[in-house]
Swiss-Prot record:
Pfam families: DAO. This is Glycine oxidase. It comes from Pseudomonas aeruginosa (strain ATCC 15692 / DSM 22644 / CIP 104116 / JCM 14847 / LMG 12228 / 1C / PRS 101 / PAO1). Monomer. Catalyzes the oxidation of glycine, leading to glyoxyl imine and hydrogen peroxide as primary products; glyoxyl imine is used for the biosynthesis of the thiazole ring of thiamine. Otherwise, glyoxyl imine is spontaneously hydrolyzed in water to produce glyoxylate and ammonia. Can also use sarcosine (N-methylglycine) as substrate. It catalyses: glycine + O2 + H2O = glyoxylate + H2O2 + NH4(+); sarcosine + O2 + H2O = methylamine + glyoxylate + H2O2. Its EC number is 1.4.3.19. One of its GO terms (biological process) is thiamine biosynthetic process. The keyword Secreted does not apply. Belongs to the DAO family. ThiO subfamily. Its cofactor is FAD. The gene is thiO.
Length: 364
């Protein structure tokens, strides 16, 4: 009989990992303390690219490139399977007035990515509502955004087709089941759940969950707040990014503006100060938004990690314990590659990319 894997955490990383493991023929039990996909996976903007990809390490770049190329097919597959459209919306992205534009263009040439310098007039022609005063632009075609909550819902629905997968929501993990040095399951609010392997994919909460084992995982919550406007469907044809803030168009005319970076522990309370700052950024990017009220304002907790390099693989000294966590600002961006790589390693397949940079060994 195939191995049983207990996956802790049903955000996009946990959902997609469970799917990949089930596709690989393993028996999977997915455990989520609340509802699937309701934490950072719900709260993020959904750009299928790191905000500044040239500023990241080769380790993050390798995961991002594989995932970006995979997302359109994943979106179509989930729509076909479930009837729920994750809305992989390919619109392209303009970066405005970059301080490190030379480095960005060098990175694009090195990695053969379609990022190029364009006349600022082109940006203003493509985005008629763009604020005045921007001097320089670079553009990358093919950059998509995904409707995070719909991606999570479609992933959850897709899991129902697998006879070898169980999902337990409203089930909080409260401890680890041990057999000597081996981790053999989790103690939960609804009883014990055992498996041959246990995979932790609990995002910002991963570090706290590992503390009872004496492990110090440098993954900490980093709060991000966003606001949402409702405009005409054709109001913003492209994504735009300047001074670390971005505007993302959804197909139905919703415009997301983000995001803050705050070290506030596990507090997810939206603040007036952040809304004021985000509204100022919205007005600078798209002045027509200045006279509009946001229709929503929320916060989520990213799993902050050193250099944003996730932990993917087995934990030394704790046989049976695996990690897929610590993706920081790029959980959605890196999810397809991270989860496929994890499934490759766990099932003994040839890995899609070199797993060494992500191994927990030597990093805990």
């Amino acid at each position: 009989m195939s191995e049983r894997v207990v996956v802790v955490g049903a955000g996009v990383i946990g959902l997609l990992t469970a799917r990949e493991l089930a596709l690989a023929g393993l028996r999977v039990t997915l455990v989520e303390r609340g509802e699937s996909g309701r934490e950072a996976s719900w709260a993020g903007g959904g750009i299928v690219s790191p905000l500044y990809p040239w500023r990241y390490s080769p380790a993050v770049t390798a995961l991002a490139h594989w995932s970006q190329d995979f997302y359109p097919a994943l979106g179509q597959r989930l729509l076909d399977e479930t009837g729920l459209d994750p809305e992989v919306h390919t619109v392209g992205l303009y970066w405005l007035d970059l301080d490190d534009q030379t480095e960005a263009l060098q990175w694009a040439r090195k990695h053969t990515r379609p990022l190029k310098e364009v006349p600022i007039e082109e940006a203003y022609a493509a985005v008629p509502g763009l604020g005045a005063g921007f001097q320089r632009a670079v553009y990358m075609s093919g950059v998509a955004n995904v409707r995070n909550p719909r991606l999570a819902r479609s992933l959850r629905a897709s899991l129902q087709q697998f006879a070898n997968l169980e999902l337990h929501e409203q089930t909080e993990v409260r401890g680890w089941l041990r057999d000597g040095d081996r981790v053999v399951g989790v103690a939960t609010s609804r009883g014990e759940i055992r498996g041959d392997k246990v995979l932790l994919a609990a995002g910002a909460w991963s570090g706290e969950l590992l503390k009872p084992l004496g492990l110090e995982l440098p993954v900490v919550p980093v709060k991000g707040q966003m606001i949402l406007y409702k405009c005409a469907a054709d109001f913003l044809p492209r994504m735009v990014l300047a001074k670390g803030r971005y505007a993302i168009p959804r197909r139905d005319g919703h415009i997301l503006i983000g995001s803050t970076l705050e070290h506030s522990g596990f507090d997810k309370t939206p603040t007036d100060e952040a809304q004021e700052s985000l509204r100022a950024s919205a007005a600078e990017l798209l002045p027509e938004l200045a006279d509009m009220q946001p229709v929503a304002h929320w916060a989520g907790l990213r799993p902050g990690s050193p250099e944003g390099i996730p932990y993917i693989g087995p934990v030394p000294g704790f046989d049976g314990l695996w990690l897929n966590t610590g993706h920081y600002r790029n959980g959605l961006v890196l999810a397809p590659a991270s989860c496929r790589l994890l499934a490759d390693l766990m099932s003994g397949r040839e890995p899609i990319i070199d797993p060494a940079p992500y191994a927990p060994a030597g990093r805990l």
